[in-house]
Swiss-Prot record:
Protein name per UniProt: Lens epithelial cell protein LEP503
Entry comment describing in which tissues the protein is expressed: Preferentially expressed in the lens epithelial cells.
PANTHER family xref list: LENS EPITHELIAL CELL PROTEIN LEP503
Superkingdom, natural source: Eukaryota
Length: 61
């Protein structure tokens, strides 16, 4: 019998892990905090994702 697999969210940075928790499809969900804090956190997560995508693109080129 196979050992139970750990969800993908444990391998991701904590901010993305927080965004992914609670979704059945395990897709990112933007969580807004209060005022500018939520916007700042969302912008940081978007910047992180874009940076990762750019790095992967550069590695594949």
């Amino acid at each position: 019998m196979k050992p139970p697999m750990q969800p993908l969210t444990q391998a991701l940075p904590f901010s993305l892990r927080d965004a992914l928790q609670g979704t059945g499809l395990r897709v990112p969900v933007i969580k807004m905090g209060t005022g500018w804090e939520g916007m700042y956190r969302t912008l940081k997560e978007v910047a992180y994702i874009l940076l990762c995508c750019w790095c992967i693109k550069e590695l594949l080129d």
